[in-house]
């Protein structure tokens, strides 16, 4: 299968000054409105990971749920949800982290993983890496390891992928944007 980064990038809408002035938000909803683009994204990830050796897929709240759940279904893997604070009903582990917009907490059910499990983590975008780093810390606290962190978009100028790599976590993104790219 051939992956055309230009086609995907053309369906990621830049929203200027959202959620605050000076930010160009990368809106992926047009990707999900195009059955062809969604299939291309899902199939690209599935093809990359179909023979990979990991036990679970971890999806980040909220846009990471969209692609993570599709890939978990396609690859027949258990799906672990990493949620924003206060959204999970049972016993949780929590981890604080910094985002490009401020401070937040990420939670996961404490019984989601066991020692020896290996997690492929999904989010829509890697910016500062804060969410995925918090998730990686939670995974490690449960005795599991991180197979890779994957996203549709990388913003390399914000250094998130580099931070993850420095923690020993490989990353994979389908496309990337410069901060000023429209």
UniProtKB/Swiss-Prot annotation:
Lyase among keywords: no
InterPro entries cross-referenced by the UniProt entry: Ade_phspho_trans (IPR005764), Adenine_PRTase (IPR050120), PRibTrfase_dom (IPR000836), PRTase-like (IPR029057)
Catalytic activity: AMP + diphosphate = 5-phospho-alpha-D-ribose 1-diphosphate + adenine
Keywords of the record: Cytoplasm, Glycosyltransferase, Purine salvage, Transferase
UniProt lineage: Bacteria, Pseudomonadati, Pseudomonadota, Gammaproteobacteria, Pseudomonadales
Compartment(s): Cytoplasm
Keyword Transferase attributed: yes
Pathway terms, separated by semicolons: Purine metabolism; AMP biosynthesis via salvage pathway; AMP from adenine: step 1/1
GO biological process, one term: adenine salvage
This protein's name: Adenine phosphoribosyltransferase
UniProt EC number: 2.4.2.7
Function: Catalyzes a salvage reaction resulting in the formation of AMP, that is energically less costly than de novo synthesis.
Subunit structure of this chain's protein: Homodimer.
A GO cellular-component term linked to this record: cytosol
Gene Ontology molecular-function annotations: adenine phosphoribosyltransferase activity
Gene field: apt
SUPFAM superfamilies attached to this UniProt entry: PRTase-like
